[in-house]
Amino acid sequence: DKNCVLQAEGSDQWGNITTGIDLIRKKTGKEAYGFTMPLVLDKTGKKFGKSEGNALWLDKNKTSSYELYQYLVNVDDSLVIDYLKIFTFLSKEEIEEYERKNNEHPEAREAHIALAREIITDIRGEEEYLKAKKISDCLFKGDITLLDEDELEDAFKGAPSFDINVGDKVIDMLINAK
């Protein structure tokens, strides 16, 4: 229907690739092809994905831009340059410059911030990147009162919380906290 003749998957998905190629051939009568790409692993060698419970979603309703920003600026130093090479359209020279800066002043996190900027801007737009950066800057360097209600919700989505009633005693709240 979509004139698809290429099945692309992670290197651990060879069975899915061959099944996809067979399906394309049977449905269209056309030749189909497959290719694999290396898996993206975390610093412990664990792959990313739904089944691993550590998926990063393109859909901002599943992974907010702030969550994605925080993940990317906290990527292990040993992975950030590889991620710039894999996930961005930065030139070889730009990446080499970030690598130099990262080696000289890792605490500045310039490569990490570039990674977050490039990925979020590419998949969600500059406005989402700027919103995520604003939330992060307000929480970690500035004034949280500068955040609007939506930004606060993004910042604290998933944080442990519970409802309280006005007039409850502190001791009762502590006992009922989960």
Task: Please report, for each region that a protein language model flagged, where it lies by residue.
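NTP-dependent nucleotidyl-transfer catalytic core
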Residues: 1-21, 27-33, 46
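Conserved nucleotide- and phosphate/pyrophosphate-binding catalytic cores
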Residues: 24-178
